[in-house]
Every structure is written in C-alpha cells, then in structure tokens.
C-alpha cells in the first residue's frame, strides 16, 4: 500500500499551504483529499507534486505492506 503521510511533512518543511500547492500544480481539491485519504492517484499527479515541491518521490510517498 502506498501512503502519502510524508506529503504533509514535506509541505511544512517548504512552508507551502494546501492552497499554494493547488495553485502551483493545478491539482484540484478532490485529488488533494484523495492524497490525504491515501487513495490511488495518477503518476502524473505525483510528478506535479515532486516538481512543485522540488523533492523526490520518497519525500511525499511511502510503501508499507498491508
């Protein structure tokens, strides 16, 4: 299972709010809610997040066994 708990941590480190992230990436509110609920998202969304936050995938996502 992929979880996105690290996303909030990375956002805090970079002092970026959810609103700013949405504006910077064009990701809608529904997708942000899906991220916070650890639901499936498209890889292009992950790419947008990593680009906007200037980070690696492991800075926003983590694999944990079910």
Sequence positions of predicted segments:
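A short, Lys/Arg-rich alpha-helix, primarily the initiator
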Residues: 1-20
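Short, charged recognition helix plus adjacent turn
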Residues: 9-10, 35, 61-66
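Alpha-helical residues within the helix-turn-helix
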Residues: 12, 23, 51
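Residues in the helix-turn-helix
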Residues: 20, 31, 59
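Recognition helix of helix-turn-helix/homeodomain-like DNA-binding domains
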Residues: 27-40
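Hydrophobic micro-packing sites on short alpha-helices
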Residues: 48-50, 60-61
